[in-house]
UniProtKB/Swiss-Prot annotation:
Name used for this protein in its record: PRA1 family protein D
Stretch list, region Disordered: 163-182
Gene Ontology cellular component annotations, sorted alphabetically: cytoplasm; endoplasmic reticulum; endosome membrane
InterPro entries linked to this entry: Prenylated_rab_accept_PRA1 (IPR004895)
Origin species: Arabidopsis thaliana
Length: 182
C-alpha cells in the first residue's frame, strides 16, 4: 500500500514537472521588454499565463511551501490536505462512491477547498499564506506582462480559443463556417 502511494505521488510529480515549459525559456532575459501598450500587455499576460501555467503553478506552490515552513503544525496539516486532494481528486479514475452514493467531482472539489481554507484558518497561517499568494500572483503577472511572446510556439490545441482558430475545417471555409441560405 505504501509503495503504491509513493509510486502514485512520484508519477504525478513527474507528469506535472514534465508538463512544465523549459525553465530556460521561462527565464530568458532576452525575451523581456516593456509592452508598447496596455493591449499588448494584456495579450502578453494572457499568452504567457496560458503557455507557462505549470511553471507559474510550481512557483506559487514553492512560495506557499516556504511560507508554511516556519509552522510545523501547518506543514503537517497541509501534508494531510495535500494527500486528501491527491487521493480524493487527482488520483481517482472513477467517481467517488460513499455508502453507495456517487459524489460529483464538483462537490468533492468544493469540500476539499473548504478543508484547505479550514486548515489555513485553524493553523493560524491564513494571513501569511494569503499575503504570499497575493505577492506571488503580482510577481507572476509582472513577469507575464514583461516577457515577450514572439518566441513562444503555440498550438491551436494549447490556445484558450482552441479549434476556433483552426483554418483546416472539415470542408468549410475556416472561421466563416458552413452557412446555408434561409
Amino acid at each position: 500500500m505504501a509503495n503504491q502511494v509513493i509510486t502514485g505521488i512520484k508519477e504525478t510529480a513527474q507528469s506535472i514537472t514534465g508538463a512544465a515549459r523549459p525553465w530556460g525559456d521561462f527565464l530568458d532575459l532576452s525575451a523581456f521588454s516593456f509592452p508598447s501598450s496596455i493591449a499588448d500587455a494584456t495579450t502578453r499576460v494572457t499568452q504567457n499565463l496560458t503557455h507557462f501555467r505549470i511553471n507559474y503553478s510550481i512557483i506559487l506552490s514553492i512560495l506557499l511551501g516556504l511560507t508554511l515552513i516556519t509552522r510545523p503544525i501547518a506543514i503537517l496539516a497541509f501534508i494531510a490536505v495535500g494527500l486528501a486532494w491527491f487521493f480524493l481528486y487527482f488520483a481517482r479514475e472513477e467517481p467517488l462512491t460513499i455508502f453507495g452514493f456517487t459524489i460529483d467531482d464538483g462537490i468533492v472539489a468544493v469540500l476539499l477547498i473548504g478543508l484547505s481554507i479550514g486548515s489555513l484558518v485553524t493553523t493560524g497561517v491564513w494571513l501569511r499564506a494569503l499575503t504570499t499568494v497575493g505577492f506571488g500572483v503580482l510577481v507572476l503577472i509582472l513577469h507575464a506582462a514583461l516577457r515577450g511572446t514572439d518566441d513562444l510556439v503555440s498550438d491551436d490545441l494549447e490556445s484558450p480559443y482552441g479549434p476556433m482558430l483552426s483554418t483546416s475545417g472539415g470542408g468549410n471555409d475556416g472561421a466563416r463556417g458552413d452557412y446555408s441560405g434561409i
